[in-house]
Amino acid sequence: MPNITGGAGEILVVMDQFNWDNSAGEMLQDILKEELPGLPQSEPLFDVIQITAASFDSFYKFHRSIVMTSIDSNLEPRVRFRENIWAKPQIMVQLEAPSSSALHTLIRENEARIQSFLVQYDRDRLMATYLDSKDPAIQKELSAHHQVRLAIPRGYNLDFSKDEYSSVSIEA
């Protein structure tokens, strides 16, 4: 299976323009662009890219995080959380509904589940990346002096380490 494309914190939403510009799309945008708490400046949870189903081709199929909406009168409302459909490690939230109003209701009723799934999976992937690139020497030193286990990425320098405190920096 191919590797994912797209950056950390980036969500690809596949939704027709009419719904994107109306209540279902606005609600989905509110969920995905909610302000991150605790930062000194306003930052959204995710950077959101919206495309239509007609534009969703082999280039976009490998995106790391996809929210795909489908509206068809033959569909029952449902949310599916899927992994590794076209690439690895990929996630997808599928939202299916028989109408625009049913899609809006489906999004509203599953707001917390949708956001939690996307946030947790993105966080887990980011942590795995840092764990894969950690500097074991700095980790060992910090553990010995402070009884704490931190995954410090390679490229950082341990300026000094004492029993009371340590200093780690990176040259920009």
Residue positions per predicted region:
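N-terminal targeting sequences that direct proteins away from the cytosol to non-cytosolic compartments
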Residues: 1-172
